């Protein structure tokens, strides 16, 4: 088996940057930053969302609109008036008198 083909699997400290929540988990994440947690030094990875801040786990429904896409949409289309629904038109096949539709041909 070849040496040095797989990344090193080790315990890494993950820190939620929005809540400050910290947890240790096995990972191959590569970093030079380290931090002391519960008396041991671990490589550290800063994450923006974890189980302590994600709405699914916290039960809060919060709209995160970092891009402002909803505001742009509302600003662009707020002045447009909704048009009245168009009446449906029925289209019928009109054949000249005396001509009948030919039956569908069967494929062999």
From Swiss-Prot:
Span list, region Disordered: 85-108
Domain of life, per lineage: Bacteria
Classification via InterPro entries: Ribosomal_bL28/bL31-like_sf (IPR034704), Ribosomal_bL31 (IPR002150), Ribosomal_bL31_B (IPR027493), Ribosomal_bL31_sf (IPR042105)
MF annotations from Gene Ontology: structural constituent of ribosome
Keywords: Ribonucleoprotein, Ribosomal protein
SUPFAM superfamilies for this protein: L28p-like
Keyword Amino-acid biosynthesis: no
Basic residues composition bias: residue spans: 97-108
The keyword ATP-binding appears for this protein: no
Coiled-coil ranges per UniProt: none
GO BP term, pick one: translation
Similarity annotation: Belongs to the bacterial ribosomal protein bL31 family. Type B subfamily.
Quaternary structure (record): Part of the 50S ribosomal subunit.
Protein name (database record): Large ribosomal subunit protein bL31B
Lineage: Bacteria, Pseudomonadati, Chlamydiota, Chlamydiia, Chlamydiales
Gene that this sequence comes from: rpmE2
């Amino acid at each position: 088996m070849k040496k040095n083909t797989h990344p090193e699997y080790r315990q890494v400290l993950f820190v939620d940057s929005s809540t400050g929540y910290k947890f240790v988990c096995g990972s191959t994440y590569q970093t030079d930053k380290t931090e002391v947690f519960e008396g041991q030094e671990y490589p550290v990875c800063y994450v923006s969302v974890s189980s302590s801040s994600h709405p699914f786990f916290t039960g809060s429904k919060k709209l995160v609109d970092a891009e402002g896409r909803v505001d742009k949409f509302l600003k662009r289309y707020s002045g447009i008036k909704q048009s009245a629904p168009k009446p449906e038109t029925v289209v019928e096949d009109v054949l000249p008198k005396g001509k009948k539709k030919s039956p569908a041909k069967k494929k062999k």
